[in-house]
Amino acid sequence: MSTSTEHRWLAFDTSTDVLSLAVARGGQVWTQTLPGGAQASSGLIPAVLAMLSDADMPLASLDAIVFGRGPGSFTGLRTACAVAQGLAFGADVPVLPVDTLLAVAEEARWTQVQAGAIAPDAALTVLALLDARMDEVYSAAYRWEPVPGASHGRWHEALPLQVGAPEKLHMPNDLVVLQAGNAFSAYGDRLPHVAPGGLRCEALPTAAALLRLASALWAQGLAVPAEQAMPLYIRDKVANTTAEREAMKAQAVEAKTALAKAAAQP
């Protein structure tokens, strides 16, 4: 998939210990990587506004704000959703939520294609794995297939999102060509074995991957109003507590306030 030259996107992911941002305009892409984790809540809004300024792209000119909705760090997901809500409300643009494990799969496929390890038009199944802490792993499998007569392909879910002990993960029926994520150093041999001829590669849900996925998701009508920017939890902790909801509201207000201040500057 390639980023559409007809769309203007802002993308960010804060689901891991890395804060990833990107902006796309007219075929040009700006990317930035910053420390995530606890620093994401204070660093995301200034980084977004600075990147949009560098790209000479007003927030209101965006087609959508693309963000990683989870699974991942609870704090990181709340930050991403709150900032996406606040900026989208302030600029009157929709949001485009993307599963972080799909972004991992796309980043891994893209990286391996660029390295020459996988042919650009090769169909493959990717098992995406992210460290969920607490001795567990988030996982999902996706199948990428080329579109006949086109230069891009499509992703299909081969195995739904799950969380559990590494040795108890369900495997898709398709042959997994590529395992990707950040769980290998922590769990090693406890993870499913790599199929003969398969590969393992480190990959994170980057904002650049979100951009590459955005056009297809947009075409499927998956953009939603700002208030529907909600985190995806797949542990038992599926509902925000009152404190968490208040924290998200506060961050959303902060994002709208920052946007208003930026707009008021000469």
Can you describe what each PLM-predicted range is?
Residues 198-266:
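Acyltransferase
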Residues 51-55, 90, 108-111, 210-218, ...:
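Stable alpha-helical structural segments in soluble proteins, enriched in small hydrophobic residues
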Residues 66-94, 100:
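DPxDG-like acidic metal-binding loop motif
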Residues 16, 134, 239:
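Short, glycine/acidic-enriched loop or turn micro-motifs at the edges of active sites
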Residues 35-43, 74, 78, 82, ...:
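Residues at secondary-structure transition points
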Residues 2-71, 266:
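N-terminal beta-alpha supersecondary unit
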Residues 3, 39, 94-206, 259-265:
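Surface "functional belts" at beta-alpha junctions
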